[in-house]
Amino acid sequence: MTKNFIIKTIIVLVLFLLNFSIANAKCKFMMDIGDKYTDSHKDKYGILYGEDDDQYAEVKFPAADFCPNDNFDDNFFIRYTFISDRLAAIQLFADNSIDNSATESMKLMKYAKRVYGDFDTGGNPQYYNNFNIWEKFQKYIVYNRKLIENIWDEEIYISSDKYYEELALYQSMSELIEPLEEEN
């Protein structure tokens, strides 16, 4: 009797701990904001820059590669943005190019609430059309969900003040250069 009770207690405890660890799992991103893309990253993920080597790079991976416990399917991706080999931003986003099923699944919203904190989505979360910002560990995290011409645009954007400013500067410089190239 005592032996059966101990075995049942251990099984229940193990199942509880396993369930708790999976429920609180979060994506294990390639690296943290500001970290350098090293040779070991190159070996694992490939080189960042192409022929132009302008020190700006974006690489995209299926979210399931970095978030195996979150049931993200083929409609969810992670985009890493690098400036001078440093990770400047992470975007976890839903690809609704075919239909809105990724956003309608509520997976990204549930992930944001579970990992970064709850926020008010109104009476029906399916119709949430807004954003929420968290500031944590010298980073900011933005959950953004907006409806544009009947297509949901949904993402979690992670960066820091320093790298946000660098990205904004890079984009403004790119906009200045593009019209000059078109004139020639």
Region locations from a protein language model:
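Non-cytosolic coordination micro-motifs
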Residues: 25-63, 89, 94-184
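A near-ubiquitous, low-amplitude feature marking generic local secondary-structure context
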Residues: 8-9, 23-24, 65, 73, ...
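Hydrophobic alpha-helical segments, principally membrane-spanning helices and signal/leader peptides
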Residues: 4-6, 54-55, 68-69, 74
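Classical Sec-dependent N-terminal signal peptides that target proteins to the secretory pathway
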Residues: 1-25
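Sterically constrained small-residue positions within well-ordered secondary structures
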Residues: 16, 69-71, 83, 125, ...
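Compositionally biased P/S/T/G-rich terminal and signal peptide-adjacent segments
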Residues: 62-84
